[in-house]
């Protein structure tokens, strides 16, 4: 059965053939960030796939992760293609390196997840918050419900973590 919801007024549909993404967004709907872990090589992976990208095994389990990490990279969007994002310009799309599995299996490898920068209430980040975030900023996952069963993982500044004095930002 397909899963459906709404994010920023836009319809979201996860087809019933896409079991891996259905599972991921259902866990998010329970306010839980889970990733696939290979039962053979024990490496975790995102996005969800039908086989391990490291050893090609099809055996996996969903494992919870803490949901804290560091901004590895980001895009600051000033021209929204989707109309629902226009009131939130500029907004950040973050690539977050989770604390789990850093530099594994090789140096500079990691478990990374994309998502929008948000406020604690689940709304997209204000311009003031966007200006505070750069590479090295510590963030944690938050969830925005999209329907009865699914939620969108978002990133908020981790107020409990030590932050860089000046996170690196792309020059504009």
Q: What is the role of each PLM region?
A:
Residues 37-40, 54-57:
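Short, cysteine/histidine-rich loop/knuckle motifs that typically chelate Zn2+
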Residues 1-36, 133-134, 142, 147:
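A broadly conserved sequence feature marking short terminus-proximal activation segments
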Residues 72-130:
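Glycine-rich active-site loops that engage anionic ligands at enzyme catalytic sites
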Residues 46, 60-61:
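Short functional micro-motifs and their immediate structural scaffolds
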Residues 68-70, 138:
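Residue-level marker of beta-strand positions
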Residues 32-35, 42, 49:
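Residues immediately within or flanking Cys/His clusters that coordinate Zn2+
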Residues 101, 110-172:
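Well-ordered alpha/beta subsegment
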């Amino acid at each position: 059965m397909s899963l459906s919801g709404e994010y920023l007024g836009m319809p979201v549909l996860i087809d019933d053939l896409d079991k891996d993404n259905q599972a991921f967004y259902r866990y998010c709907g329970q306010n839980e960030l889970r990733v696939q872990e290979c039962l053979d090589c024990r490496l975790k992976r995102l996005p969800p796939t039908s086989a391990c990208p490291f050893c090609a095994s099809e055996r996996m389990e969903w494992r919870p992760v803490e949901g804290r990490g560091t901004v590895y990279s980001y895009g600051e969007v000033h021209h929204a293609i989707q109309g629902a994002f226009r009131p939130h310009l500029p907004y950040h799309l973050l690539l977050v390196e989770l604390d789990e599995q850093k530099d594994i299996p090789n140096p500079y490898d990691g478990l990374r997840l994309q998502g929008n920068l948000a406020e604690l209430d689940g709304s997209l980040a204000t311009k003031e918050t966007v200006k505070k975030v750069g590479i090295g900023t510590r963030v944690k996952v938050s969830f925005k419900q999209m329907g009865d069963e699914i939620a969108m993982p978002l990133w908020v500044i981790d107020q409990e973590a030590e932050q860089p004095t000046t996170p690196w930002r792309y020059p504009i």
